[in-house]
Amino acid sequence: MYAQVAVENVNCTFDKDYDYSIPQQLEGKALVGCRVAVPFGVGNRKRIGIITRLTDSTQGKRIKSISAVLDEAPLLSYEMMSLARWISEQTFCTYYEAVKAMLPAGINHKIIRSFCAVPGVDESIVASLDSDEKQVYDYLLSRSGYVKPENFLKTLGFDVSSDIPERLLKAGLLAANDDAVRNIGDNNIRMVRLCEGSDDVSMTKKQSEVVNVLKDVGSVSVKELCYFTGYTPSVISALEKKGVVECFEREELRSFVSRYAVQSAYDSGEIHLTDEQQKAYDGLLEDYKSGTGKTALLYGVTGSGKTSVYLKLIDAVLADNKTVIVMVPEISLTPQTLSVFHSRYNDGVAVFHSALSAGERADEWKRVKNGDAKIVIGTRSAVFAPLENIGLIIIDEEQEHTYKSEQTPRYNAKSVARYRAAWHKGLTLLAAATPSVDSFAAAKSGKYSFYELKNRYGKAVLPQVVTVDMRNEQQTENRELSHELIEELNKNRTDGKQSIVLINRRGYNTFVSCTACGEVVTCPNCSISMTYHAANGRLMCHYCGYSVRFTQKCPSCHKPALRYAGFGTQRIEDELEKAVPGARIMRMDTDTASSRFAHEECLNAFAKGDYDILVGTQMVAKGLNFENVTLAAVDSVDQQLYNDDFRSLERTFSLLTQVVGRSGRGEHPGKAIIQTLTPENEIIRLAAKQDYDAFYDTEIRMRRLMIYPPFCDICVVGFSGADEVKTRVASQRTLDKIKELTAGKYKNEKLIVLGPLPARVPRVNKKYRYRLIIKCRNTKGFRSMISEILKDFYGDSKFSDVSVYADMNPEITV
């Protein structure tokens, strides 16, 4: 019997299924969807792979054998194996990279190599070693068994990345052993139970009491048994030696309980819909019942009650014994969403997002795979939840860019959702107050079903929106907080109401410059200005993480003339404390919400009224529902509005609409303030009116004229290398290859190629970056051409130190 195996850590040139024989002792264990350890390459170093197919014969010669099967049962179903193949073809990644994206990090394996000395080696070989090699060899000779290199290298004072062990291995002085090790172990509990036929064994009084407890409870953890009886584990050990009891391990899944989830108005009761909501629900239910794998768009203004429609639809899906995935774009939305679903569906809900530890993520994944949870809630990775019989996938705030992965594999969760829903003949539901232009166009064309909620739920009305011209404010030295905003914030606090203020920049000041020579302090690794963070007194790069303590000495002219400029969330927090005396202010950005449960803690405290003002970045703008918030403000949108990405207008309109929508969601009317240097801008004017339809009409005309999605697809081919000239030459070579192929066998592929050009931030982490932007159609022929180009590039040794990737329809093209 033979297995075809997709192996990890290969580039696209070598991405294929490799044949391995299955040893007799592993037959019946080596199944499709199981991971295996296999020898790979000339040196036969072990690598992790996954079995994609079993066969009775092979055309290969000198077939190697599988070393070990790493899973007791297949991790991936036939559907997920097919999905991995589809992702690898769509996103230009390897098959195993697609597989790895589907699995939680906590169940991943890695190969750990250890070494031992080979005794009795020819003395002349030992004599030829240099002093460092001799020191390592002698040390390992003195040790028994295999030792991990990081252990003995550190002990001997060498860098743990030293190649000394590999040199000694090549010389035949060391032997190596490769083991596949789980990243995170199972959470096992030591249990105890009675053995059969042990009644006649003589026991002490303590031992008899322990046995009597076990007769009542059956099996129990050692820890609990000691607690109940008041005895130490030594009593249990003595009984185990006598054969009266046996101890065993039981896995206990680490359950994620949202301890800080905000209170929810939803419970298990009947959901009552308005006529408008009922109409949308009826249509969506019909789409779901059709069993044809449809996609629908639910377009509803902020506060229109989309969640009520979701829940009623989910009730219908669960009644059919089917499962549900609910995706949200930001971790900050997960606590509120989770509280809604937990209050209604209890432990039938699992959660996938990065605030969980690796062990918790692994256990939630197991809980879903075991069938213990029928609903999965989470961010982008939740789309890979190992659910069977999926009836509904909801993508909330579907316009958000976070549904697109910026790392390999560069998948779009919306596309994966449509694939999975079609496979299970379920429904994909996209929902938003400001749908993406692409999705709205698909709905307009009839590709998606379309439903609309035009009114806010209950008595709530859309807030009054005021646009403040900051050019006038700056003349009076009010640089960031206008008179009107300060007045409204104070009034809101006096009235016992809450406010949300958004500023889309982290840190205290957005850059630091020298007043003597004009130099802006930039990151030494990246071509980007550094941001001052007052909390730790450091300048930080938000791209590579480099930081340095702030001093006033200019690194260019060396004069003590460095000054802050620009405003970040930390600075606005300080300004608000001065402008609204006595206000309780909470700042929420990736700096303050980076710890586990930080989002829950922040949102729960704000929901309970512990704070008057919530100030933060985009994470405070979307999907949050606080009935006591009657004022929402945007500090400045001009930086986002006037950048060079073709989606900048769409993103700005969406952000403004979302922020405005946080206000007045309860019984009290709301107000929103937009501060801008260009109040006459059409996008700002339309966002103030919450007029998405007019925005769409304007935007779609521009996209048609300029040939941007949805009137084409865009593929970005990116290059990165430490040598700028070589990186630029690599991008030009690829352009020449595209011209060659489109003049020949791919002549039917119609393209518009822009570049090569430096990326918007041309240097990150000491590497220069170039881009080719290709306007195309995402056809099988085009993807085949790009795959051929990538394989050709990786096969050219001249560019071995330049990395390349292709990204289809990225959210950010520059």
Language model features with spans:
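Short, low-order "capping/linker" segments at domain edges
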Residues: I63, P762-K775, M808-V814
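Short beta-strand elements
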Residues: A175, M586, L741-A759, S800-M808
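A short, contiguous, amphipathic alpha-helix enriched in charged residues
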Residues: Y2, A30-V32, D347, K726-E740
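Short amphipathic alpha-helical segments
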Residues: K16-Y18, S221, D713-C715, Y768-Y770
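Accessory, non-ATPase domains that flank or precede helicase/AAA+ motor cores in DNA-metabolism machines
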Residues: M1-A432, K444-A460, K780-S787, K791-N809, ...
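Inter-lobe coupling/hinge segments of SF2-like helicase ATPases
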Residues: S264-T274, Q278, D282, T292-R728, ...
